[in-house]
From Swiss-Prot:
The species this protein was found in: Arabidopsis thaliana
Membrane topology reported for the UniProt record: Multi-pass membrane protein
Transmembrane segments: 35-55, 66-86, 117-137, 154-174, 176-196, 208-228, 260-280, 289-309, 332-352, 370-390, 408-428, 433-453
NCBIfam families from the UniProt entry: matE (TIGR00797)
Highest taxon of source: Eukaryota
Keyword Iron-sulfur: no
GO MF terms, alphabetically ordered: antiporter activity; xenobiotic transmembrane transporter activity
Pfam family, one: MatE
Gene Ontology CC annotation, any one: membrane
Family affiliation: Belongs to the multi antimicrobial extrusion (MATE) (TC 2.A.66.1) family.
Protein name as it appears in the record: Protein DETOXIFICATION 4
Length: 476
């Protein structure tokens, strides 16, 4: 017999403990215990392609240019979609675990993996023709050839993501972050050895770098799969209910599509930024500097992503359990962590603004330009961290559609036009483009803050219950 969705009286449980009675301190500890390992896991996953790019780059400028172009194209057309779709499981699996509907977690996870596979097939077809597509778009034929060859060998990585990402959310929803951490770090060490072997020892160049990513991600997928299959920690949650499969697929796409829109709209904006920088007066300088700023911002962003994943998990768990007040305190705890980390890294970046550019370039002009943009980059650190946490709240509650609409308004109706106007009409060049990003992030932050502050948490818990019941009854 199944566990009840909510307590016996079917009423939302009022939480007597609030931030006044120390609940905030308790939540800070719980969110931190999830956030730190998840941030580390995200960094480890981010470093896999970075290491391959670094190793391939030592084989010449052509190899580096081709790999960089392929990385950009595959991120936009494939990996962003995979990362976005799996955001639905933060809602579904997290709330199911909180409601003690453990068998639903396995069904949701297997449904997500099954749904991802045909999407990967469609994306793979696009990647197969990447070389011809890039040439038709006016890219250099030699660079396009390297990029196309690299993308072909990344196709297995795409299918590995179809397994890794749902299993990651499956474990995260249960708070099983330490196994994730161990497997991610092991995979990173494994990747370094494989990448060196294929690229340097066997002399496979950029193709070897791409193959190394594929081998490493499949290693990660297999280790996670074995843990989920054989670990006693997943005994209750790995079960599959076949009659719920179709309804779970519908639920996956219902929340996955707007979740993917949330992420893709943000990723695509930065690719648009780089494209626009190539149209400025000094395209080599502007593109180099904006690429450095984007890389720096991305490296920092993995930390707020870890906090957001933790907040999303706590919020979804507590809404599923019918304890909305604790979910609310989890949001406050996440914002406290955001304030500390964004302040620390912003101060650190500003203090070293005159030398950070040397980590990427020996050009004094580039280094000085990066230093000039550092105050804006510091502001991006603050805003990106804030929006990351609140986007985590959105995924935990299940209102990804609001997040997607917010990104359209903030980035494409406000941020991008402002950036293009400042860059070209006001001749602020790269600084103008980044100002547009900051303005867009500010609008996004304001809208998310208003929505979160006005949220009826008891109503969100009731919606979580209805979501689970509709899934049980085979409704989407």
């Amino acid at each position: 017999m199944e566990e009840p969705f909510l307590p016996q009286d079917e009423q939302i449980v009022p939480c007597k403990a609030t931030w006044k009675s120390g609940q905030l301190n308790v939540e800070l500890k719980k969110v931190s215990r999830l956030a730190v390992p998840m941030a580390t896991v995200t960094i480890a996953q981010y470093l896999l392609p970075v290491i391959s790019v670094m190793v391939a780059g030592h084989n010449g400028e052509l190899q580096l240019s081709g790999v960089a172009l392929a990385t950009s194209f595959t991120n936009v057309s494939g990996f962003s979609i995979m990362f976005g779709l799996v955001g639905s499981l933060e809602t579904l699996s997290g709330q199911a675990y909180g409601a003690k509907q453990y068998e639903k977690m396995g069904t949701y996870t297997y449904s997500a993996i099954s749904s991802n596979i045909p999407i990967c097939v469609l994306i793979s077809i696009l990647w197969i023709y990447m070389e011809k597509l890039l040439i038709s778009l006016g890219q250099d034929p030699d660079i396009s050839r390297v990029a196309g060859s690299y993308a072909l060998r990344l196709i297995p990585t795409l299918f590995a993501h179809a397994i890794v990402l749902p299993l990651t959310r499956f474990l995260l929803a249960q708070g099983l972050v330490l196994p994730l951490l161990y497997f991610a770090l092991t995979t990173l060490l494994f990747h370094i050895a494989v990448c060196w072997t294929l690229v340097s020892a066997l002399g496979l160049g950029s193709n070897g770098a791409a193959l190394a990513i594929s081998v490493s991600f499949w290693f990660f997928a297999m280790t996670l799969s074995c843990y989920v299959r054989f670990s006693s920690s997943c005994e209750k949650t790995r079960r599959f209910v076949s009659q719920d499969f179709l309804s779970s697929v519908k639920q996956f796409f219902r929340y996955g599509v707007p979740s993917a829109a949330m992420l893709c709209l943000e990723w695509w904006l930065f690719e648009l930024l780089i494209l626009c920088s190539g149209l400025l007066q000094n395209p080599k300088l502007e593109t180099s500097v904006l690429s450095i700023c984007l890389t720096t911002a991305t490296l920092h962003y993995v930390i707020p992503v870890g906090v957001a994943a933790a907040v999303s998990t706590r919020v979804s768990n507590k809404l599923g359990a019918g304890i909305p007040q604790v979910a609310r305190v989890s949001v406050l705890a996440g914002l406290c962590l955001w304030l500390v980390e964004s302040s620390f890294f912003s101060i650190l970046l500003f203090a070293f603004r005159n030398i950070i550019g040397y980590a990427f370039s020996n050009s004094k002009e580039v280094v000085d330009y990066v230093a000039d943009l550092s105050p804006l980059l510091c502001l991006s650190f603050v805003l990106d961290g804030f929006t990351a946490v609140l986007n985590g709240v959105a995924r935990g509650c299940g209102w990804q559609h609001i997040g997607a609409l917010n990104n359209v308004v903030a980035y494409y109706l406000v941020g991008a036009p402002v950036g293009i106007y400042l860059a070209f009409s006001c001749e602020l060049n790269g600084k103008g483009l980044w100002c547009g990003v900051v303005v867009g992030s500010a609008v996004q932050a304001i809208i998310l803050a208003i929505v979160t502050a006005s949220m009826n948490w008891k109503e969100q818990a009731k919606k979580a219950r209805k979501r689970l019941i509709s899934s049980e009854n085979g409704l989407a």
